[in-house]
């Protein structure tokens, strides 16, 4: 890292960190201060800061606000919750909402409990809210595991009327994934038909149930699907006047083309035509236009990691401004893998695949193979009845030959997958679980259009992302709820985003540009809605106005658009340290996309860049000033500044004094022990010599003593106080240097305690060892 010529110094009166004991490991926390991928949100707003752009709606003891329906004509949001349906004026204004209590009779609840269901499950969870016509809504609920549907007069909004069975339209419980859409006043639903949830079905529910058009029960049609979304596209959106309305269903199902112990899941899209009447003999009351294809959103493991479809949103441009586009969230089916990918799919690419080769499952090898073109009958199976087909005397699906219907019954799956629009995901993240997505198109100040996506997470956060080229850049992470909970539904209404969850409906202002306080902040936000106004000296939602406004979505070149702002140097914090301590200096830029560098004293020799800052090993050369400088959009500024100082005046010399005293004591101890041993040895030698001289004088016989003589035997001498302190025999048996026990050595680096600082000056201490 380059050395800095400018070294910030602590000024008088500036705060300093409290000194901490000698040889402690100081750890200062801080976020990432380096270049990161655009899948990481540029900025994050905690709940305390996010509340300014949020409006909440909740009713005590009412839960599961999971079904949202926006009626732009009446500026009303309809909310389906547990046992209740609300009608709220948009945007939220604090006005008292209208409500309908759609409760389950006690007899139904008792019957539900007798079937072994829990008390909390035996409620009416609203699953469908749809606009039936200008005066009525269609609604369906689980009704304590006995689905019911009815209509609501929106002018009176008092009760659910004309109740009828909801089987085949609505799931039996909210845990069963389902999807439904109204097209031409007709409900198209994808759900399960039986109580156990083992009979999946896609229906056109109009008239009597026995007259419905539905999917066949063959597992080749639907095999344990989890439905995600249903979308209706009209010929006008295609620019095809000869076409028919098409209904697309998105789901994940278990593949039958793999021989594996694991149930391999595959994301797929299916399409049916609104004019389908079924077959005359073969496929009676069954879809004759049901075709499905794999959706490929490659992940880190070449597609396996993105095998579960979580949600799909359709972005519909204005008529004549382009064709719709589907945005899908994909995740992994394997436990422990937190992977989310976002892919875009064009309807024309789906159409191309549906017009391509069919796949045939070979039962002997469980592998799918393409059907040869010569084996495909004419007219082509699965096609909608168009004017061109009518000219060929096929006025409806009832007039199709049996060979065509038999083929489509046995070959509903296409051989080729649908690839994403750019051939790869727009975003892949391994640390965030996305559950819901909505999208809209925004016109920037330059007139160029950008797709803005809102991604709801598993823990209740909202990520706002803009599509720039072939990738998504996540601009902001917004915490929605005080307590983490999944985002269950999202709808857009003009500049407001409406979010449904278990405990509330949250309204988010998507044009909250005023919180960006400077020109550089406004430009770096890269929000197509926001622009900096030199006239007002604030960040505003431009609304197509151009006078005195600047914006740069793709480059965010602050240096050329904004006047140079006066640099505000941060407070320099003094950090008291001791020799050999490890100190981590945090750097906390406001943007995770900023590139940061450290300027440090030229004498520092041991430093390590980390995700949370800079780690420095304290040496005399490491003393001095440190500065973290971050750059984004061509503008650089110092984010954090520190000054390493000795913990106290005695810290640096006391270390050398302590080590020197220890070494001196060590050598003095060896010298004293040696002198003591020499003196003891000489004393014993002199005593032995005196004994030998005394024996010579009395004619002592060194052999066996004769009878009548007295033998003299010497008992072992009792140990002296010196021997008790240092027994010679024990010392010689020791394993130390020279046969003696090793002396006590002063550990120059005792085990350091850990001090965790949440910032500077010292905030909290957690000492594990001192």
UniProtKB/Swiss-Prot annotation:
Task: Give the Sema domain ranges.
Answer: 42-510
Region (Disordered) location: 696-725
Q: Please indicate the ranges of residues that lie on the Extracellular side.
A: 35-659
Q: Where is this motif: PDZ-binding?
A: 768-770
Q: Which GO cellular component term is one of those annotated?
A: postsynaptic density membrane
Q: Which UniProt keywords apply?
A: Cell membrane, Cell projection, Developmental protein, Differentiation, Disulfide bond, Glycoprotein, Immunoglobulin domain, Membrane, Neurogenesis, Phosphoprotein, Signal, Synapse, Transmembrane, Transmembrane helix
Q: Which residues lie on this side of the membrane: Cytoplasmic?
A: 681-770
Query: Where in the sequence does glycosylation occur per the annotation?
Result: 64, 133, 509
Per UniProt, residues of the PSI domain are 512-563
Q: Which residues carry this modification: Phosphoserine?
A: 718, 720
Q: Where is the signal peptide?
A: 1-34
Instruction: Kindly list the residue ranges recorded as spanning the membrane.
Output: 660-680
Ranges for the Ig-like C2-type domain? 580-635
Gene Ontology process terms (BP): axon guidance; cell-cell signaling; negative chemotaxis; negative regulation of axon extension; nervous system development; neural crest cell migration; positive regulation of cell migration; retinal ganglion cell axon guidance
Question: Which PROSITE patterns does the record match to this protein?
Answer: SEMA
Q: Which parts form a coiled-coil structure per UniProt?
A: none
Q: InterPro entries from the entry?
A: Plexin_repeat (IPR002165), PSI (IPR016201), Sem4F_Sema_dom (IPR047085), Sema4F_C (IPR045791), Semap_dom (IPR001627), Semap_dom_sf (IPR036352), Semaphorin (IPR027231), WD40/YVTN_repeat-like_dom_sf (IPR015943)
Relate the protein's function as given in its record: Probable cell surface receptor that regulates oligodendroglial precursor cell migration. Might also regulate differentiation of oligodendroglial precursor cells. Has growth cone collapse activity against retinal ganglion-cell axons.
The subunit structure is: Interacts (via PDZ-binding motif) with DLG4/SAP90 (via PDZ domain 2); this interaction may promote translocation of DLG4/SAP90 to the membrane.
Family according to the record: Belongs to the semaphorin family.
**Protein name per UniProt:** Semaphorin-4F
The source organism is Homo sapiens
Taxonomy of origin reads:
Eukaryota, Metazoa, Chordata, Craniata, Vertebrata
